[in-house]
Amino acid sequence: MDTLTAISRWLAKQHVVTWCVCHEGELWCANAFYLFDAQHVAFYVLTDDKTRHAQMSGACAPVAGTVNGQPKTVARIRGVQFKGEIRRLEGQESDVARKAYLRRFPVARVLPAPVWEIRLDEIKFTDNTLGFGKKMRWLRDSSAQQA
């Protein structure tokens, strides 16, 4: 199994992403339920334009973040660190992503918040179940690397 496939399978089983934005020297983090799109290597999240992180993001901004479980032992630690770009989706792109998001999280139908895409450009996946400190790396537009 290649690196991106292994990472994608794990991300598909999780549901909360943390991402951080920086604007004019100020940092802010946010958490949200996400839908992972393995084909585009992106998360889709819903968040209101009035939130601090959305206002700091504007239409598009660089981001970094994490997805992790809550294991009880070090030997079971698995998690992703990433960097990429967040942007507010519009039009048909937004409609398609919202439809997919609502299939996974039907309760979100009552939320009028816009859809945002977090495009992942670099991923580091730590998976201690494969051996302590096992890391897999993926970069957009390049072949996967293992460390």
UniProtKB/Swiss-Prot annotation:
InterPro entries: Split_barrel_FMN-bd (IPR012349), UPF0306 (IPR011194). Gene3D superfamilies: Electron Transport, Fmn-binding Protein, Chain A. HAMAP family: UPF0306. NCBIfam families: PRK03467.1. Belongs to the UPF0306 family. This is UPF0306 protein YhbP. It comes from Salmonella arizonae (strain ATCC BAA-731 / CDC346-86 / RSK2980).
